[in-house]
Swiss-Prot record:
Protein known as: Seven in absentia homolog 3
UniProt-listed Pfam families: Sina_TRAF
Source organism (scientific name): Homo sapiens (Human)
Zn-finger segments (SIAH-type): 61-132
Function per UniProt: Negative regulator of PRKN translocation to damaged mitochondria. Acts probably by destabilizing PINK1 protein, hence inhibiting PRKN targeting to dysfunctional depolarized mitochondria.
Compartments, record wording: Mitochondrion
GO process annotations (BP): negative regulation of protein targeting to mitochondrion; proteasome-mediated ubiquitin-dependent protein catabolic process; regulation of protein stability
Keywords linked to the UniProt accession: Metal-binding, Mitochondrion, Zinc, Zinc-finger
Keyword tRNA processing annotated: no
Entry similarity comment: Belongs to the SINA (Seven in absentia) family.
Amino acid sequence: MLFFTQCFGAVLDLIHLRFQHYKAKRVFSAAGQLVCVVNPTHNLKYVSSRRAVTQSAPEQGSFHPHHLSHHHCHHRHHHHLRHHAHPHHLHHQEAGLHANPVTPCLCMCPLFSCQWEGRLEVVVPHLRQIHRVDILQGAEIVFLATDMHLPAPADWIIMHSCLGHHFLLVLRKQERHEGHPQFFATMMLIGTPTQADCFTYRLELNRNHRRLKWEATPRSVLECVDSVITDGDCLVLNTSLAQLFSDNGSLAIGIAITATEVLPSEAEM
C-alpha cells in the first residue's frame, strides 16, 4: 500500500510539472522569450546553521529539508554551455578587497555548505557540474519560480549567460522575523566588483495590469549572496505582494541585463 501511495504521488508530481511547462509556454511563447521553470530547494546551509543555534532550545521543532531542485528550460539553444569569460577579465582588481590577486574564491552556491575553493574562471563549471545549476542564455529571459507556498528557508537559483559573462540569479524565501517570510531576489556577476559595475540588471513582475520593476547594478559573487540579502540591496517582497504577482503558486520574473559601459579589454578588441 505504501509503495502504491509513493508511486501515485510521483505521478501527480509529473502531472503538475507538465502543467507548469505548458503554462509557461502558453504565457511567454508569443513574446519569444526563453523561459525556465525552477523548482525550489530548501537552503541546507541556512537550515544547518539554524539547527546549530537552536540545539539548546528544545521547544523549537527540527526541520527536515526536502524537495530537490529541478530546472526545466524552454528554448532550442538552452542545452549549449558556453564559457565566454576570458582569463584576463577575471583577475582580482580591488586591492582593498583582495590583497593577493591569486587568492581563490569560495563556492558561492547559497544552497549548500560547500568547502570548494577555486579561481573565478572555474566557478561556472563548478556550479554546473557539482551543484547542477542550469544556465540560460539571452539578454532577456523569464524565470518561473514554482511552489512559492513552501515554508522558508527555500531558494530558487539559476545562472544567466549574456554579454560574454555569467550571472547568478538567486530568489530566496527567508524569515527575518519569525512567522513573517519574505522573498529576496538578486542578480550577481560571476566576476570582480569592477566588472559588475559595468552592468545593470532589471527584474520585472507583471500580472493583472500591475507592474513592479527593480533595477540596479549587480554585486559580485565575491561579496557573498547572504550579505547582499542582509543589506537589503535587492528586490524584497512580502508574502502578500508576492501572492499578488503569482499565478497558482508560481512567480514569473522577467530578467534583462544591459552593459552600462565598455569593459577595458573589450575596448582594446
